[in-house]
Protein backbone atom coordinates (compact mmCIF):
# COMPACT_ATOMS: atom_id res chain seq x y z
CA UNK A 1 0.00 0.00 0.00
CA UNK A 2 1.36 3.41 -0.97
CA UNK A 3 1.64 5.89 1.89
CA UNK A 4 0.54 9.18 0.39
CA UNK A 5 1.63 12.44 1.94
CA UNK A 6 -1.33 14.14 3.64
CA UNK A 7 -2.91 17.06 1.82
CA UNK A 8 -4.34 19.08 4.69
CA UNK A 9 -6.80 21.91 4.10
CA UNK A 10 -8.75 23.95 6.62
CA UNK A 11 -12.38 24.82 6.02
CA UNK A 12 -14.16 27.65 7.84
CA UNK A 13 -17.82 28.59 7.95
CA UNK A 14 -19.83 31.16 9.87
CA UNK A 15 -23.42 30.80 8.76
CA UNK A 16 -26.69 32.69 8.91
CA UNK A 17 -27.25 31.69 12.54
CA UNK A 18 -24.31 33.94 13.55
CA UNK A 19 -23.57 31.68 16.52
CA UNK A 20 -19.90 31.21 15.76
CA UNK A 21 -17.24 29.74 13.50
CA UNK A 22 -16.98 26.09 12.45
CA UNK A 23 -13.49 24.95 11.50
CA UNK A 24 -12.32 21.60 10.14
CA UNK A 25 -9.14 19.89 8.99
CA UNK A 26 -9.66 17.66 5.96
CA UNK A 27 -7.12 15.38 4.27
CA UNK A 28 -7.46 15.22 0.48
CA UNK A 29 -4.57 12.84 -0.24
CA UNK A 30 -7.14 10.16 -1.11
CA UNK A 31 -10.91 10.29 -0.58
CA UNK A 32 -11.74 13.39 1.50
CA UNK A 33 -11.39 12.52 5.17
CA UNK A 34 -12.53 14.73 8.04
CA UNK A 35 -9.65 14.62 10.53
CA UNK A 36 -10.45 17.31 13.12
CA UNK A 37 -13.24 19.76 13.84
CA UNK A 38 -14.05 22.49 16.35
CA UNK A 39 -16.42 25.37 17.04
CA UNK A 40 -15.59 28.87 18.27
CA UNK A 41 -18.41 31.11 19.57
CA UNK A 42 -18.86 34.54 18.04
CA UNK A 43 -18.33 37.46 20.48
CA UNK A 44 -21.68 38.93 21.48
CA UNK A 45 -20.91 42.50 20.40
CA UNK A 46 -19.85 41.34 16.92
CA UNK A 47 -22.91 39.13 16.64
CA UNK A 48 -25.23 42.00 17.56
CA UNK A 49 -23.66 44.35 15.02
CA UNK A 50 -23.88 41.76 12.24
CA UNK A 51 -27.49 40.94 13.12
CA UNK A 52 -28.42 44.62 12.94
CA UNK A 53 -26.60 45.08 9.63
CA UNK A 54 -28.36 42.09 8.04
CA UNK A 55 -31.83 42.99 9.33
CA UNK A 56 -31.65 46.70 8.56
CA UNK A 57 -29.73 46.35 5.31
CA UNK A 58 -28.14 49.78 5.66
CA UNK A 59 -24.98 50.98 7.37
CA UNK A 60 -22.04 53.35 7.09
CA UNK A 61 -18.90 52.55 5.12
CA UNK A 62 -16.98 52.95 8.39
CA UNK A 63 -19.05 50.23 10.07
CA UNK A 64 -18.79 47.94 7.04
CA UNK A 65 -15.00 48.27 6.99
CA UNK A 66 -14.67 47.70 10.72
CA UNK A 67 -16.83 44.57 10.62
CA UNK A 68 -14.78 43.26 7.69
CA UNK A 69 -11.62 43.73 9.78
CA UNK A 70 -13.08 42.34 13.02
CA UNK A 71 -14.30 39.18 11.31
CA UNK A 72 -10.84 38.58 9.85
CA UNK A 73 -9.32 38.93 13.32
CA UNK A 74 -11.89 36.47 14.70
CA UNK A 75 -11.19 33.99 11.91
CA UNK A 76 -7.42 34.22 12.37
CA UNK A 77 -7.75 33.76 16.15
CA UNK A 78 -9.85 30.64 15.49
CA UNK A 79 -7.31 29.19 13.05
CA UNK A 80 -4.33 29.87 15.31
CA UNK A 81 -6.08 28.43 18.38
CA UNK A 82 -7.22 25.37 16.39
CA UNK A 83 -3.72 24.65 15.10
CA UNK A 84 -2.10 25.18 18.49
CA UNK A 85 -4.65 22.95 20.25
CA UNK A 86 -4.03 20.14 17.77
CA UNK A 87 -0.25 20.69 17.44
CA UNK A 88 -0.24 21.53 13.74
CA UNK A 89 2.04 24.11 12.14
CA UNK A 90 0.91 26.59 9.47
CA UNK A 91 3.34 25.08 6.94
CA UNK A 92 1.51 21.74 7.21
CA UNK A 93 -1.66 23.32 5.79
CA UNK A 94 -2.03 23.74 2.02
CA UNK A 95 -4.66 26.48 2.28
CA UNK A 96 -7.67 27.75 4.20
CA UNK A 97 -11.06 27.77 2.52
CA UNK A 98 -12.97 30.57 4.25
CA UNK A 99 -16.54 31.38 3.31
CA UNK A 100 -16.69 34.70 5.15
CA UNK A 101 -19.87 36.06 6.70
CA UNK A 102 -22.75 36.67 4.33
CA UNK A 103 -24.44 39.99 5.10
CA UNK A 104 -26.44 40.30 1.87
CA UNK A 105 -27.31 37.98 -0.98
CA UNK A 106 -29.28 39.42 -3.88
CA UNK A 107 -28.97 37.16 -6.94
CA UNK A 108 -32.22 38.22 -8.64
CA UNK A 109 -31.90 42.01 -8.59
CA UNK A 110 -31.16 44.14 -11.66
CA UNK A 111 -27.51 44.20 -10.61
CA UNK A 112 -27.01 40.83 -8.88
CA UNK A 113 -24.50 40.69 -6.06
CA UNK A 114 -23.56 38.84 -2.91
CA UNK A 115 -21.53 40.24 -0.03
CA UNK A 116 -19.42 38.28 2.43
CA UNK A 117 -17.35 40.11 5.04
CA UNK A 118 -14.00 39.03 6.47
CA UNK A 119 -10.76 40.43 5.03
CA UNK A 120 -9.01 37.40 3.50
CA UNK A 121 -5.73 39.32 3.09
CA UNK A 122 -5.65 39.91 6.83
CA UNK A 123 -6.55 36.29 7.56
CA UNK A 124 -3.63 35.07 5.41
CA UNK A 125 -1.24 37.54 7.05
CA UNK A 126 -2.28 36.65 10.61
CA UNK A 127 -2.12 32.88 10.10
CA UNK A 128 0.78 32.46 7.69
CA UNK A 129 -1.44 30.28 5.48
CA UNK A 130 -2.73 31.09 2.00
CA UNK A 131 -6.48 31.66 1.95
CA UNK A 132 -9.12 30.93 -0.66
CA UNK A 133 -12.20 33.12 -0.30
CA UNK A 134 -14.82 35.05 -2.25
CA UNK A 135 -16.31 31.84 -3.68
CA UNK A 136 -19.78 32.99 -4.63
CA UNK A 137 -19.13 35.96 -6.92
CA UNK A 138 -17.36 33.90 -9.60
CA UNK A 139 -20.47 31.77 -10.03
CA UNK A 140 -22.64 34.90 -10.19
CA UNK A 141 -20.30 36.42 -12.77
CA UNK A 142 -21.17 33.42 -14.94
CA UNK A 143 -24.89 33.98 -14.53
CA UNK A 144 -25.44 31.77 -11.49
CA UNK A 145 -27.19 32.40 -8.19
CA UNK A 146 -23.90 32.10 -6.30
CA UNK A 147 -25.65 29.52 -4.13
CA UNK A 148 -25.91 26.85 -3.06
CA UNK A 149 -22.29 25.81 -3.52
CA UNK A 150 -22.24 22.85 -1.14
CA UNK A 151 -24.10 20.37 -3.46
CA UNK A 152 -20.92 19.90 -5.52
CA UNK A 153 -19.17 18.70 -2.35
CA UNK A 154 -22.15 16.52 -1.45
CA UNK A 155 -21.88 14.87 -4.85
CA UNK A 156 -18.15 14.26 -4.32
CA UNK A 157 -18.58 12.49 -0.98
CA UNK A 158 -22.17 11.19 -0.65
CA UNK A 159 -23.33 10.04 -4.10
CA UNK A 160 -24.17 6.32 -4.35
CA UNK A 161 -25.29 4.48 -7.47
CA UNK A 162 -27.63 2.25 -5.43
CA UNK A 163 -29.66 5.07 -3.92
CA UNK A 164 -31.50 8.21 -4.89
CA UNK A 165 -29.80 10.36 -2.27
CA UNK A 166 -30.83 13.75 -0.95
CA UNK A 167 -28.50 15.61 1.40
CA UNK A 168 -30.37 18.10 3.56
CA UNK A 169 -28.48 20.80 5.44
CA UNK A 170 -30.67 22.47 8.07
CA UNK A 171 -28.64 25.52 9.04
CA UNK A 172 -30.06 29.01 9.33
CA UNK A 173 -31.53 28.31 5.91
CA UNK A 174 -32.38 24.77 4.77
CA UNK A 175 -30.87 23.59 1.51
CA UNK A 176 -31.00 20.26 -0.23
CA UNK A 177 -28.79 18.49 -2.76
CA UNK A 178 -30.48 15.91 -4.98
CA UNK A 179 -27.97 13.23 -5.97
CA UNK A 180 -29.90 10.85 -8.21
CA UNK A 181 -27.79 8.42 -10.31
CA UNK A 182 -27.54 9.29 -14.01
CA UNK A 183 -29.16 12.69 -13.44
CA UNK A 184 -27.70 16.16 -13.16
CA UNK A 185 -27.33 17.23 -9.54
CA UNK A 186 -30.03 19.59 -8.33
CA UNK A 187 -29.51 21.80 -5.31
CA UNK A 188 -31.58 24.62 -3.86
CA UNK A 189 -32.70 26.35 -0.69
CA UNK A 190 -36.03 25.02 0.57
CA UNK A 191 -36.62 27.93 2.96
CA UNK A 192 -35.92 28.74 6.60
CA UNK A 193 -34.15 26.16 8.72
CA UNK A 194 -33.22 27.40 12.18
CA UNK A 195 -33.01 31.14 11.55
CA UNK A 196 -36.60 32.07 12.48
CA UNK A 197 -36.61 29.58 15.36
CA UNK A 198 -33.41 31.11 16.75
CA UNK A 199 -34.54 34.71 16.30
CA UNK A 200 -37.96 34.06 17.85
CA UNK A 201 -36.70 32.27 20.96
CA UNK A 202 -34.02 34.91 21.47
CA UNK A 203 -36.67 37.62 21.40
CA UNK A 204 -39.06 35.87 23.80
CA UNK A 205 -36.82 33.69 25.98
CA UNK A 206 -33.40 35.35 25.70
CA UNK A 207 -31.89 32.09 24.44
CA UNK A 208 -29.67 31.59 21.40
CA UNK A 209 -31.58 28.52 20.22
CA UNK A 210 -34.37 26.12 21.19
CA UNK A 211 -32.42 23.12 22.45
CA UNK A 212 -33.88 19.91 21.04
CA UNK A 213 -37.07 21.85 20.17
CA UNK A 214 -38.17 21.73 23.82
CA UNK A 215 -39.87 25.16 23.85
CA UNK A 216 -41.64 24.50 20.55
CA UNK A 217 -42.88 21.19 21.98
CA UNK A 218 -44.85 23.15 24.59
CA UNK A 219 -46.79 24.96 21.86
CA UNK A 220 -49.40 24.05 19.28
CA UNK A 221 -49.18 24.64 15.54
CA UNK A 222 -51.30 27.60 14.41
CA UNK A 223 -52.68 26.37 11.07
CA UNK A 224 -53.84 29.83 10.00
CA UNK A 225 -50.37 31.27 10.57
CA UNK A 226 -48.69 28.28 8.90
CA UNK A 227 -50.79 28.74 5.76
CA UNK A 228 -49.96 32.45 5.68
CA UNK A 229 -46.23 31.74 6.03
CA UNK A 230 -46.34 29.11 3.29
CA UNK A 231 -47.98 31.67 0.98
CA UNK A 232 -44.59 33.39 0.67
CA UNK A 233 -43.83 33.47 -3.10
CA UNK A 234 -40.33 32.01 -2.56
CA UNK A 235 -41.79 28.58 -1.82
CA UNK A 236 -43.41 28.30 -5.25
CA UNK A 237 -40.34 29.45 -7.21
CA UNK A 238 -38.72 26.77 -9.38
CA UNK A 239 -35.19 25.59 -8.61
CA UNK A 240 -32.46 26.76 -8.74
CA UNK A 241 -33.31 29.26 -6.02
CA UNK A 242 -31.63 30.65 -2.95
CA UNK A 243 -32.64 32.83 -0.03
CA UNK A 244 -31.40 34.09 3.34
CA UNK A 245 -32.03 36.20 6.41
CA UNK A 246 -32.65 39.23 4.22
CA UNK A 247 -36.09 37.63 3.60
CA UNK A 248 -36.75 35.23 6.47
CA UNK A 249 -36.37 37.40 9.57
CA UNK A 250 -38.53 38.74 12.40
CA UNK A 251 -39.66 41.72 10.33
CA UNK A 252 -41.11 39.26 7.80
CA UNK A 253 -42.67 37.09 10.52
CA UNK A 254 -44.22 40.00 12.42
CA UNK A 255 -45.63 41.36 9.15
CA UNK A 256 -47.31 37.99 8.50
CA UNK A 257 -48.78 37.89 12.03
CA UNK A 258 -50.01 41.49 11.72
CA UNK A 259 -51.63 40.64 8.39
CA UNK A 260 -53.63 37.81 9.98
CA UNK A 261 -54.63 39.96 12.95
CA UNK A 262 -55.88 42.65 10.57
CA UNK A 263 -58.04 40.15 8.68
CA UNK A 264 -59.43 38.66 11.89
CA UNK A 265 -60.18 42.08 13.39
CA UNK A 266 -62.26 42.92 10.32
CA UNK A 267 -64.26 39.74 11.01
CA UNK A 268 -64.47 40.48 14.76
CA UNK A 269 -62.55 37.26 15.44
CA UNK A 270 -59.83 36.94 18.08
CA UNK A 271 -56.85 34.60 17.87
CA UNK A 272 -54.07 34.02 20.35
CA UNK A 273 -50.47 34.09 19.15
CA UNK A 274 -48.72 32.62 22.18
CA UNK A 275 -44.95 32.75 21.58
CA UNK A 276 -44.55 28.99 22.05
CA UNK A 277 -47.35 28.38 19.52
CA UNK A 278 -45.53 30.55 17.00
CA UNK A 279 -42.35 28.56 17.70
CA UNK A 280 -44.20 25.28 17.09
CA UNK A 281 -45.56 26.75 13.86
CA UNK A 282 -42.08 27.78 12.74
CA UNK A 283 -40.87 24.19 13.26
CA UNK A 284 -43.77 23.04 11.09
CA UNK A 285 -42.83 25.66 8.47
CA UNK A 286 -39.30 24.26 8.28
CA UNK A 287 -40.54 20.66 8.05
CA UNK A 288 -43.37 21.34 5.59
CA UNK A 289 -41.23 23.37 3.19
CA UNK A 290 -38.64 20.56 3.14
CA UNK A 291 -41.24 17.81 2.72
CA UNK A 292 -43.02 19.69 -0.07
CA UNK A 293 -39.74 20.05 -1.95
CA UNK A 294 -38.76 16.38 -1.59
CA UNK A 295 -42.22 15.06 -2.48
CA UNK A 296 -41.88 16.56 -5.95
CA UNK A 297 -38.98 14.22 -6.78
CA UNK A 298 -39.60 11.13 -8.91
CA UNK A 299 -37.41 8.01 -8.92
CA UNK A 300 -37.73 4.22 -8.92
CA UNK A 301 -34.62 3.76 -6.76
CA UNK A 302 -34.67 3.44 -2.95
CA UNK A 303 -34.61 6.95 -1.50
CA UNK A 304 -32.37 8.03 1.35
CA UNK A 305 -32.18 11.39 3.09
CA UNK A 306 -28.95 12.37 4.85
CA UNK A 307 -29.52 15.27 7.25
CA UNK A 308 -26.83 17.61 8.59
CA UNK A 309 -26.64 21.02 10.23
CA UNK A 310 -27.97 22.23 13.57
CA UNK A 311 -31.53 21.24 12.68
CA UNK A 312 -30.49 17.58 12.75
CA UNK A 313 -30.22 17.95 16.54
CA UNK A 314 -33.82 19.22 16.85
CA UNK A 315 -35.92 16.13 17.64
CA UNK A 316 -39.16 17.87 16.58
CA UNK A 317 -37.78 18.61 13.12
CA UNK A 318 -36.34 15.11 12.73
CA UNK A 319 -39.60 13.50 13.91
CA UNK A 320 -41.51 15.65 11.43
CA UNK A 321 -39.26 14.46 8.60
CA UNK A 322 -39.57 10.79 9.65
CA UNK A 323 -43.37 11.06 9.94
CA UNK A 324 -43.90 12.83 6.62
CA UNK A 325 -41.32 11.11 4.41
CA UNK A 326 -42.45 7.51 4.82
CA UNK A 327 -40.83 6.31 1.58
CA UNK A 328 -37.44 7.80 2.51
CA UNK A 329 -34.73 6.23 4.64
CA UNK A 330 -33.91 9.16 6.95
CA UNK A 331 -30.51 9.30 8.70
CA UNK A 332 -27.65 11.76 9.21
CA UNK A 333 -24.32 12.47 7.51
CA UNK A 334 -22.50 11.44 10.71
CA UNK A 335 -23.23 7.84 9.74
CA UNK A 336 -21.36 8.54 6.47
CA UNK A 337 -18.24 9.89 8.19
CA UNK A 338 -19.04 13.62 8.24
CA UNK A 339 -20.28 15.05 11.54
CA UNK A 340 -23.63 16.85 11.13
CA UNK A 341 -22.16 20.08 12.52
CA UNK A 342 -19.22 20.31 10.14
CA UNK A 343 -20.35 19.31 6.64
CA UNK A 344 -20.52 22.92 5.40
CA UNK A 345 -17.08 23.78 6.78
CA UNK A 346 -15.70 20.63 5.14
CA UNK A 347 -17.27 21.77 1.87
CA UNK A 348 -15.22 24.97 1.94
CA UNK A 349 -12.04 23.00 2.59
CA UNK A 350 -12.98 21.02 -0.55
CA UNK A 351 -13.67 24.21 -2.51
CA UNK A 352 -10.21 25.48 -1.53
CA UNK A 353 -8.69 22.18 -2.67
CA UNK A 354 -10.51 22.53 -6.01
CA UNK A 355 -9.27 26.11 -6.47
CA UNK A 356 -5.65 25.26 -5.72
CA UNK A 357 -5.89 22.40 -8.23
CA UNK A 358 -7.82 24.48 -10.81
CA UNK A 359 -10.83 22.15 -10.74
CA UNK A 360 -14.34 23.41 -11.55
CA UNK A 361 -16.38 23.45 -8.36
CA UNK A 362 -19.79 24.85 -9.18
CA UNK A 363 -22.65 22.88 -10.71
CA UNK A 364 -24.53 24.82 -13.42
CA UNK A 365 -27.53 22.52 -12.89
CA UNK A 366 -27.62 23.79 -9.30
CA UNK A 367 -26.73 27.47 -9.48
CA UNK A 368 -27.88 28.26 -13.01
CA UNK A 369 -24.41 29.39 -14.11
CA UNK A 370 -23.61 29.23 -17.82
CA UNK A 371 -20.51 27.12 -17.21
CA UNK A 372 -18.67 25.02 -14.65
CA UNK A 373 -15.78 27.13 -13.38
CA UNK A 374 -13.23 27.16 -10.57
CA UNK A 375 -14.43 29.21 -7.62
CA UNK A 376 -12.69 31.51 -5.20
CA UNK A 377 -9.87 34.01 -5.18
CA UNK A 378 -6.42 33.15 -3.85
CA UNK A 379 -4.96 35.35 -1.10
CA UNK A 380 -1.31 34.26 -0.74
CA UNK A 381 0.30 34.12 2.69
CA UNK A 382 3.22 36.30 1.50
Curated annotation (Swiss-Prot):
Pfam families: AnmK (PF03702). GO terms for molecular function: ATP binding; kinase activity; phosphotransferase activity, alcohol group as acceptor. Gene3D superfamilies: 3.30.420.40. The keyword Nucleotide-binding applies. ATP binds at residues 15-22. SUPFAM superfamilies: Actin-like ATPase domain. One of its GO terms (biological process) is peptidoglycan turnover. It catalyses: 1,6-anhydro-N-acetyl-beta-muramate + ATP + H2O = N-acetyl-D-muramate 6-phosphate + ADP + H(+). Keywords: ATP-binding, Carbohydrate metabolism, Kinase, Nucleotide-binding, Transferase. Pathway: Amino-sugar metabolism; 1,6-anhydro-N-acetylmuramate degradation; Cell wall biogenesis; peptidoglycan recycling. It is an enzyme of class 2 (transferase). Its EC number is 2.7.1.170. The keyword Transmembrane does not apply. Belongs to the anhydro-N-acetylmuramic acid kinase family. NCBIfam families: PRK09585.1-3 (NF007139). Catalyzes the specific phosphorylation of 1,6-anhydro-N-acetylmuramic acid (anhMurNAc) with the simultaneous cleavage of the 1,6-anhydro ring, generating MurNAc-6-P. Is required for the utilization of anhMurNAc either imported from the medium or derived from its own cell wall murein, and thus plays a role in cell wall recycling. This is Anhydro-N-acetylmuramic acid kinase. It comes from Haemophilus influenzae (strain ATCC 51907 / DSM 11121 / KW20 / Rd).
Amino acid sequence: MINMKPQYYLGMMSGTSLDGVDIVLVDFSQDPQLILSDFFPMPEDLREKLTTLIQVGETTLQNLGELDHKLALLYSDCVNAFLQKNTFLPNQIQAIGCHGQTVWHSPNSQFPFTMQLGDMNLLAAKTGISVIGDFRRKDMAWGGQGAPLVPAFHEAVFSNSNFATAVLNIGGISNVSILFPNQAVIGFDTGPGNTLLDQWIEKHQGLRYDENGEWAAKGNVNKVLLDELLNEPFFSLPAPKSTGRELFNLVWLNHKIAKIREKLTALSVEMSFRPEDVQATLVELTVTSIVNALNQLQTDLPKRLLVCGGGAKNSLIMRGLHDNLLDWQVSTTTEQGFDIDYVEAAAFAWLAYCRINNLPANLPSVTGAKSAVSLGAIFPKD
